[in-house]
Protein backbone atom coordinates (compact mmCIF):
# COMPACT_ATOMS: atom_id res chain seq x y z
CA UNK A 1 0.00 0.00 0.00
CA UNK A 2 1.07 3.60 -0.59
CA UNK A 3 -0.46 6.49 1.36
CA UNK A 4 0.18 10.19 0.79
CA UNK A 5 -1.03 13.15 2.81
CA UNK A 6 -0.56 16.91 2.71
CA UNK A 7 -1.53 19.24 5.52
CA UNK A 8 -4.20 21.92 5.38
CA UNK A 9 -3.28 25.32 4.06
CA UNK A 10 -1.87 27.65 6.72
CA UNK A 11 -4.36 30.46 7.23
CA UNK A 12 -3.35 34.08 6.93
CA UNK A 13 -4.32 36.24 9.91
CA UNK A 14 -7.49 38.29 9.90
CA UNK A 15 -10.20 38.54 7.31
CA UNK A 16 -10.00 39.86 3.76
CA UNK A 17 -11.59 43.27 3.26
CA UNK A 18 -15.11 42.89 1.89
CA UNK A 19 -17.08 45.23 -0.29
CA UNK A 20 -20.72 45.51 0.64
CA UNK A 21 -20.21 43.53 3.84
CA UNK A 22 -20.03 44.61 7.45
CA UNK A 23 -17.34 47.11 8.49
CA UNK A 24 -13.93 45.60 9.37
CA UNK A 25 -14.37 46.11 13.14
CA UNK A 26 -17.78 44.39 13.10
CA UNK A 27 -16.39 41.49 11.06
CA UNK A 28 -13.52 41.12 13.56
CA UNK A 29 -15.99 41.12 16.49
CA UNK A 30 -18.08 38.41 14.81
CA UNK A 31 -15.32 36.19 13.43
CA UNK A 32 -12.44 36.92 15.82
CA UNK A 33 -10.06 36.76 12.87
CA UNK A 34 -11.16 33.22 11.94
CA UNK A 35 -11.99 33.72 8.27
CA UNK A 36 -10.98 31.30 5.53
CA UNK A 37 -7.89 32.98 4.10
CA UNK A 38 -5.41 30.33 2.95
CA UNK A 39 -1.76 30.94 2.16
CA UNK A 40 0.27 28.78 -0.23
CA UNK A 41 2.03 27.07 2.72
CA UNK A 42 0.73 23.80 4.20
CA UNK A 43 0.74 22.60 7.82
CA UNK A 44 3.17 19.72 8.44
CA UNK A 45 1.97 16.14 8.70
CA UNK A 46 3.73 14.62 11.73
CA UNK A 47 2.62 11.01 11.32
CA UNK A 48 0.42 8.67 9.35
CA UNK A 49 -1.47 5.95 11.20
CA UNK A 50 -2.96 2.80 9.69
CA UNK A 51 -6.06 1.32 11.31
CA UNK A 52 -6.77 -2.35 10.60
CA UNK A 53 -10.17 -3.98 11.14
CA UNK A 54 -10.94 -7.64 10.53
CA UNK A 55 -14.41 -9.25 10.67
CA UNK A 56 -15.22 -12.02 13.10
CA UNK A 57 -14.87 -15.52 11.66
CA UNK A 58 -17.17 -16.92 14.34
CA UNK A 59 -19.60 -15.25 16.80
CA UNK A 60 -17.50 -15.94 19.91
CA UNK A 61 -14.27 -14.52 18.43
CA UNK A 62 -13.18 -11.53 20.59
CA UNK A 63 -13.59 -8.24 18.76
CA UNK A 64 -10.83 -6.52 20.74
CA UNK A 65 -8.20 -8.54 18.88
CA UNK A 66 -9.70 -7.65 15.48
CA UNK A 67 -9.65 -3.84 15.71
CA UNK A 68 -6.17 -2.32 15.80
CA UNK A 69 -6.29 1.46 16.21
CA UNK A 70 -3.63 2.25 15.31
CA UNK A 71 -2.17 -0.89 13.81
CA UNK A 72 0.92 0.85 12.40
CA UNK A 73 2.32 4.36 12.90
CA UNK A 74 4.74 6.06 10.53
CA UNK A 75 6.52 9.26 11.64
CA UNK A 76 6.78 11.88 8.91
CA UNK A 77 9.87 14.03 8.42
CA UNK A 78 9.20 17.76 7.97
CA UNK A 79 8.45 18.43 4.31
CA UNK A 80 6.56 21.03 2.29
CA UNK A 81 5.51 18.19 -0.02
CA UNK A 82 3.57 16.35 2.72
CA UNK A 83 4.22 12.75 3.69
CA UNK A 84 4.31 9.47 1.78
CA UNK A 85 4.48 6.03 3.38
CA UNK A 86 4.50 2.49 2.03
CA UNK A 87 3.50 -0.62 3.94
CA UNK A 88 2.30 -4.18 3.56
CA UNK A 89 0.53 -6.57 5.88
CA UNK A 90 2.62 -9.71 6.37
CA UNK A 91 -0.08 -11.04 8.75
CA UNK A 92 -2.81 -10.87 6.07
CA UNK A 93 -4.81 -14.12 6.21
CA UNK A 94 -8.44 -12.98 6.01
CA UNK A 95 -10.70 -10.20 4.73
CA UNK A 96 -9.43 -6.92 6.15
CA UNK A 97 -10.40 -3.25 6.11
CA UNK A 98 -7.76 -0.54 6.43
CA UNK A 99 -8.11 3.19 7.07
CA UNK A 100 -5.35 5.75 6.78
CA UNK A 101 -5.28 8.64 9.26
CA UNK A 102 -3.02 11.64 8.66
CA UNK A 103 -2.12 13.72 11.74
CA UNK A 104 -1.08 17.37 11.47
CA UNK A 105 1.33 19.13 13.78
CA UNK A 106 -0.53 20.46 16.85
CA UNK A 107 -1.96 23.95 16.40
CA UNK A 108 -4.43 26.10 18.35
CA UNK A 109 -8.10 25.46 17.61
CA UNK A 110 -11.27 27.04 18.96
CA UNK A 111 -12.74 24.68 21.58
CA UNK A 112 -9.80 22.31 21.13
CA UNK A 113 -9.77 21.78 24.89
CA UNK A 114 -13.25 20.28 25.01
CA UNK A 115 -14.79 20.90 28.42
CA UNK A 116 -11.45 22.18 29.81
CA UNK A 117 -11.67 20.26 33.09
CA UNK A 118 -9.00 20.51 35.77
CA UNK A 119 -7.69 17.58 37.84
CA UNK A 120 -10.38 18.08 40.49
CA UNK A 121 -13.11 17.66 37.86
CA UNK A 122 -14.16 21.30 37.70
CA UNK A 123 -14.94 22.15 34.08
CA UNK A 124 -14.94 25.45 32.24
CA UNK A 125 -16.69 24.85 28.91
CA UNK A 126 -16.37 27.36 26.11
CA UNK A 127 -19.96 28.06 25.11
CA UNK A 128 -19.11 30.80 22.62
CA UNK A 129 -21.74 33.13 24.04
CA UNK A 130 -22.39 35.49 26.98
CA UNK A 131 -21.45 32.78 29.52
CA UNK A 132 -17.77 33.03 28.52
CA UNK A 133 -15.60 36.10 29.00
CA UNK A 134 -15.19 37.82 25.62
CA UNK A 135 -11.40 37.84 26.11
CA UNK A 136 -11.36 34.03 26.37
CA UNK A 137 -10.45 32.89 22.86
CA UNK A 138 -11.19 29.25 23.80
CA UNK A 139 -8.01 28.11 22.04
CA UNK A 140 -6.23 24.86 22.86
CA UNK A 141 -3.71 22.80 20.88
CA UNK A 142 -5.09 19.92 18.82
CA UNK A 143 -3.65 17.56 16.25
CA UNK A 144 -6.06 17.92 13.34
CA UNK A 145 -6.59 14.69 11.46
CA UNK A 146 -7.93 13.46 8.15
CA UNK A 147 -9.20 10.00 7.28
CA UNK A 148 -9.07 8.04 4.05
CA UNK A 149 -12.00 6.13 2.69
CA UNK A 150 -12.00 2.49 3.78
CA UNK A 151 -9.78 0.11 1.85
CA UNK A 152 -11.45 -3.31 1.66
CA UNK A 153 -9.18 -6.25 0.85
CA UNK A 154 -10.66 -9.72 0.39
CA UNK A 155 -8.75 -12.92 0.94
CA UNK A 156 -8.77 -14.96 -2.26
CA UNK A 157 -10.61 -18.28 -1.84
Task: Go through each PLM region and give its residues.
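C-terminal functional module detector
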Residues: 1-157
Amino acid sequence: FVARAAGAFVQLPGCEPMSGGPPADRLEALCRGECYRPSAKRKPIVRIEVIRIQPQNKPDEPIATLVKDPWRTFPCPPSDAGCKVEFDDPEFTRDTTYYIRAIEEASPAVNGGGLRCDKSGKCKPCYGDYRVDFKDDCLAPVEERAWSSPIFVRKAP
